[in-house]
Amino acid sequence: VQMYTDLEDAAAGLLTGDLILFVDGVNRVFKIPDQGYPGMGVQETGSEKVTRGSNEGFSDSVKTNTALIRKRLRATELKNVEQTIGRRTSTLVNLMYMEGIARMEVFEEIKKRLSRFEIDGILDSGMLEQLTERHWESPFPQFQTTERPDRAVHALLEGRIVLLCDHSP
């Protein structure tokens, strides 16, 4: 167990997977080393093979996928908003963006579209994509899908919004 007085050091520890404990009335933060990034359930990509670099792919757990992105992008500007969609399935969906890079009007529009869903359930990311498309008749893609966390991180750094859907890699 380590103690910090500087919140930036504590935030850096949190972003690397450590447990941070705040105690009311104490001017220090306790860091409990964990760094338990998930390894189970992470798959090799099927259709997006690369000759150099990692072939690590997303799993079917939104929590694992969020951790895979955070493992590569340890910036405090990386924001994550959780929403539950589906009256019966209560599917967890995460919206991730980089504060200061992403266009907030785009983020708010996607968030608004997701909150308007009146549906029994979302079973995979394909359903989510179809329901959030603005111009479904357009021949041009409005979404880019990937199986790879490194490509998702690259998209975040370009200012795009990343949607992660539970039960769907």
Language model region names:
Residues 1-169:
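Cytosolic regulatory modules rich in charged/polar residues
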